[in-house]
């Protein structure tokens, strides 16, 4: 199946969106720590399927400080356990957080570390809200794209301003 790629310029830097003709398969910040990150943001592929435009609208709403309503169709690839964890992340509403331990209990797993690994493997950052998962005792915890990006995403949702 053909892969489509587009780049979104966010207040936090470029975001690369990848899809097939029906669903988003990957969404990542260009500052990703992994070695497979392009040195510069790729140019938007033309033509792109409607799912790309839907995702760009979702991102526009998000970075405008609005709670995005319509989640684009997603097709993340992962293990059954990872997919269970990623599905649980959708229960964390915009402007809220949960701990790795809370997510572990939700998916019936005894290990918050295993949940942390699944959260870290999320291929569709931001839309699958892994940035809303924090460490115990309110610590911000890690993030595949760095804690500064995670902190800024939480600020977009006014989460950090409400915490003591």
Model features per residue range: what roles?
Residues 132-136:
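Short, basic, alpha-helical segments at the C-terminal edge of helix-turn-helix-like DNA-binding modules
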Residues 114-115:
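Helix-turn-helix DNA-binding helix
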Residues 137-164:
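…primarily DNA-binding HTH/wHTH and HhH modules…
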Residues 130-131, 153:
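Hydrophobic alpha-helical packing residues
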Residues 118:
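Residues in the recognition helix of alpha-helical DNA-binding motifs
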Residues 1-110, 156, 160-164:
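Basic nucleic-acid-binding alpha-helical/helix-turn surface characteristic of O6-alkylguanine DNA
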Residues 127:
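Major-groove DNA-recognition helix of helix-turn-helix-type DNA-binding domains
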């Amino acid at each position: 199946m053909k892969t489509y790629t587009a780049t979104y310029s966010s207040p936090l830097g470029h975001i690369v969106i990848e899809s097939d003709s029906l669903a988003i398969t990957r969404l990542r910040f260009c500052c990703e720590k992994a070695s497979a990150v392009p040195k510069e943001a790729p140019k938007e592929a033309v033509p792109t399927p409607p799912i790309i435009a839907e995702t760009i609208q979702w991102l526009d709403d998000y970075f405008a400080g609005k709670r995005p309503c319509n989640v684009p169709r997603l097709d993340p690839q992962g293990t059954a356990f990872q997919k269970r964890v990623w599905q649980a992340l959708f229960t964390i509403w915009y402007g809220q957080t949960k701990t790795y331990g809370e997510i572990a209990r939700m998916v019936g797993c005894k290990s918050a570390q295993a949940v942390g690994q699944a959260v870290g493997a999320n291929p569709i950052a931001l839309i699958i809200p892994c940035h809303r998962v924090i460490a115990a005792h309110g610590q911000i915890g890690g993030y595949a794209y760095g804690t500064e990006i995670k902190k800024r995403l939480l600020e977009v949702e006014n989460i950090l301003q409400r915490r003591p």
